[in-house]
Amino acid sequence: MNSDINMYLGREKAGIMRKRALLLRKGCSFEITSSASEDLGCRRGEFSRKHYGSVELLISSDADGAIQRAGRFRVENGSIDEISDYTPGTWRRTDVHLENPEYHTRWYFKYFLGKVHQNYVGTDAEKNPFFLSVVLSDQNNQRVPQYRAILWRKTGTLKISLPYSPTKTLSVKSILSAMNVDRFEKGPREILNPEIQKDLLVLEEQEGSVNFKFGVLYAKDGQLTDDEMFSNEMGSETFEKFLNLLGDTICLQGWAGYRGGLDTKNDTTGINSIYTVYQGHELMFHVSTMLPYSKENKQQVERKRHIGNDIVTIVFQEGDDASPSFKPSMIRSHFTHIFALVRYNSQNDSYRLKIFSEESVPLFGPPLPSPPVFTDHQEFRDFLLVKLINGEKATLETPTFAQKRQRTLDMLIRSLYQDLMPDMHKNMLNRRSFSDVLPESPKSARKKEEARQAEFVRVGQALKLKTIVRGDAPTSLVTTGLCRKEPWESQSFCSSFPYDIVCGDSWGQSLLVATDSAGVMLLEDSPTLPPVQVFDKTLTVKQMHVLEPQDLLIARADKGKDARLYVYRLSTLKQGIEERQLVRTKCDSRENKLEKTKGCHLYSINTHHGVELRIVAAIRNKLLLITRKQSRLECVSSIATVTGSTDSPVEEFQYIREICLCDSPVVMALVDGPTGENDHMICVAYRHQFDLINESTGDAYRLHHVDSNRVNFVAAIDVYEDGEAGLLLCYNNICVYKKVCPFNGATPMIQPNTSDFHFSWNQMPNATVCAFPYILAFTTDSIEIRLVVNGNLVYTAVVPELQLTASRSDIYFISSAPINSASNCSSRDTSSQSSPQTPTGYEMPVFPSPLGDGETQSKHIYKIPLSNLVGRSIERPLKSPLVNKVLTAPAPSMTGPAPMIGSTTSLSLSRMEIKEIASRTRKELLGLTEEPSSKADGNSVKQRRMSKKNKEEEQKRTAEISIAEQVGMESVDGETDIQQLCPSGSEVEVRDDSPPTANPFTFSTSFEDDILDLK
């Protein structure tokens, strides 16, 4: 009996401890009260896939109750997690982002095509052919030169960006090595034939279409079978209202835009359809009531043929929420993977959304708000279209579609390789060794090389123009009046800081930084207040943490054998600053040393340090575990009686144990156990591996092995999915998520988990920051923003000479870009013929001039509030991206003024002339006549109706406009000739919960200018 009671109490205690640990990780505390920023800092690593629905077995039955079909689908209905603090009546929204947007992912079209670049062919160690494309470009407002490389293989494309150095040459071998390709069966040879651009563009287009077709199925109240739904000849008034919200009604006869598989000649697929353009994507909707209806055919095969072959289908169902609801198992289709169920509530004029995704479809955003009810119809349209586009892209990553794409890529690459091999010994392939540096044009063959490059550019620009005219160009955001605040927008914190910053951390609204030559300084959040020196240069701090709830500053100072950890009371430092005492020196810090940490080269603290602060110091190949237990109340009382206590908190720390490793760790992270009772772990990275070390026993477990010749460890970030620990392991340009819970006693179960995933950064990061739902990579000259749950790219911004300074709370980074840089500097002005190979006869990119002797370049500090990234991802109301419906042909007419919201034109007079030339060129190609801008909407359909005669004349005109192409393509590139800016003085709607900022950085949203605009 007693044993049963003890066993029961033991289970209850374990359950209570797990719940307690979970609440602690969510920012709750039983002993102290953390600041708001501290709570956010603890929440940044908390995430849940439950926001994206849960997998359910859905069964449909007929009227007699017999089971017809069953299937496993992930259901998203905006439900609230039972342990969340949701308040009824509050809306929980997330930011709406297109994932993996084509204007960031279609590199070859954007950066290579129509520019002088180099292409190589070779075979790897497994005798699989591959192609490599390399270009040197500075297509950004900061004129930051970057090497961009694309590796084409049967498994897909791998993209990487490498920093440019005028003093260091870059070889093809080093580029391939950065892509983890070190062994070859045949070394790469350069391809000189300009026609290779067409084949490589075809390879890139295998990533998926830039245009989409979606099914729209109308279901009356009570209809539970697909035959009943497809047999609805007409829709209701509310359904017609919904269709008008989605897009515009177009006449299919003679339609020359994206047709989505519909007949545009003989009306065999209906007379009208719904069409729109959203952020550069052409969308065609297969509407069930607009497709041909047959009274004799009850199954409506013609309708099912189109809608059943759509990957994504919208189901508009009449009736209230209490009536029987649609289930995906009601539809007999092996091709449709995603269903969006839409219901309209006439009482409050709102739409309710529910998403069903086949189980194999990867997670995609944006997650549904809670509740998933939209009263703003434009807001609903934006959310729905982005959700559908992201859903179709995610479906293409399922095994079924991925295997088909891999077979197609393999066939295309092998076919292209076989076509090139007969010319291996001819002039088509350059015999230069793959270990040679990217070559310069030989002076003896300057004229020949100039002619070859001119032909290469001409072919590429003509190909780009044809792609644009055809409507297949990845020109996202061209047709939008997009001008909105993004959560990652930065604020100016300090301009023209004269010292190099080694490390830093936020202290309230201020920033504490350690410099290389001026000691430690406190920077206030005010341009009028000068920096305050806290420590002089005798104390060289290499790493620091400011823990306000603990009233503690931890710093690692000095190097080599003299390195140690120092601990200070923040209250003592603050008092010294306020009383304007003398600046502290290294000698003044003798009482603040943790002596046993002598020789420490790295340390790490636990993220959730509300109750117990744990520090692990690495001293060569030895780990020293240190703890400090003291509540905030005790700390406050000790401060109040500071006359009777010491200024140094050294005595409050205790050394727990030492753990020996087989090598010195390069990266460390502390992982909280599920109960907090002797089950904490330490993640260490060394050699070619990440290991987990049990804090209590010192036992090591292999977490991840890095299969690469060279390893550059970046970070190990502890994250907690629904309370269970996981790790984001970052090395080279790879990020891997590993789940390390649940624990079995003291042993973590580190078997492969279905929730594990990995993705590649486009550039090797120097630091990474996790702020759910985002993970940010800080590279040498860019910030790359992805989603934590799936690794999908959201945005890339170019920031020159970038360095992350602090990220424990708000994110601070430094850059050489001045605050008042010209924000209207168009990237297309300086991106003409940029290439690794010096293009004789063409203008080279304007690279920043090196500093002279004795010159020092000032740094500028910027801040991204963590509340914008973490807090607003759950609590911020969704704002419409202000994207208007567009009914237009993909080949745009630029005679009418583009609608701009508080924006300014960034084109000079010469740029406007180039724009006119490009516009006339396209009109000549299409055979269009000049139309007044006021009639643009009315004649947009007519613009797409090209006669056979015009189509024949188009081919003749193409040969006559090569000169106009070369002049105009720089403005045609991406079909964006006007950079729409959001100046700080413009009257743009700002979210209420966003702090007022000068907003020196703006992440531009035009096709070419995907950078931080400096204002």
From Swiss-Prot:
Q: Where is this region: Disordered?
A: 821-842, 924-1004
Give the highest taxon in the source lineage: Eukaryota
**Signal sequence, renumbered to the chain:** none
CNH domain residues:
498-812
Keywords noted in UniProt: GTPase activation
Extract the InterPro entries matched here: CNH_dom (IPR001180), Rap/Ran-GAP_sf (IPR035974), Rap/Ran_GAP_dom (IPR000331), Rap1_Ran_GAP (IPR050989)
Protein's GO biological process: regulation of small GTPase mediated signal transduction
Q: Where is the composition biased (Basic and acidic residues)?
A: 949-959
- GO molecular function annotation: GTPase activator activity
Biased-composition ranges, Low complexity, are: 823-835
**Domain Rap-GAP as annotated: residue spans:** 200-416
As for family, the record states: Belongs to the GARNL3 family.
**What name appears for this protein in its UniProt entry?**
GTPase-activating Rap/Ran-GAP domain-like protein 3
